[in-house]
Amino acid sequence: MTRAIGIDIGGTGIKGAIIDLDAGELVSDRIKHATPDGGEPEAIIATVAQLVDELGLKGIDHIGVCFPAVVRNGRTMSAANVSKRWIGLDADTLFGTALGRDIHFVNDADAAGYAEAVSGAARGQRGLVIMTTLGTGIGSALINDGVLIANSELGHLKLDGRDAETWAANSAREREGLSFEQWAERLTTYYRYVEALLWPELFVIGGGVSKQHAQFLHLIDVRTPMVPAALRNNAGIMGAAALAVRHAR
């Protein structure tokens, strides 16, 4: 049995659990703490250390952490909804020193997409799978034949001279009071553009609004099959843990 801890750091909450990677499931309670005000590195590291202590490290060699940032070789290159002091930080080393284990940092959308490819809605799918998370912005993950292509930022594709996410994310629907039908027209424009660039085999749609997929998914007019995410709130945790073990190998 291969076990690892997955940690999902967000702007408002930090959650984690122990994952059985062979079974593709949580084998502990999912523990959640509030993200410290300001999202400073030291405070977040302390909160993660507390969470890991509550989960327990017995039999655990690897910890994966997903984070709302572009991550290159364990270094956070951007910061969304957390302190800008994260930019350029060697997160792998800082967290590894604090927790006494090998740490692997990844982008949060990448972690969620990888989990869906390994254990969720895209399990067994060959070719290119694109997961998008529709929320405040549009997060994205590209997985080709099971291999993650890290740090895609498809929410920043330009449509009519502006970032697509400012016009097509779920936050735009809520802000402008769009019906699901009106929003689906925008999503059709967005996903057709992505299709023209990348020709994926499957789109997986995540984010909190994916719980309401029956109200809008069938209205998006694209040629690529489109399915809702299956793992929901556990996707980041599971993907971070799986990528930590894969990275170690």
Residues of each region from the PLM?
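ATP-binding/phosphotransfer module of carbohydrate and carboxylate kinases, centering on a glycine-rich
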Residues: 1-62, 71-75, 93-100, 115-130, ...
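General beta-strand structural signal in soluble alpha/beta enzymes
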Residues: 103-108
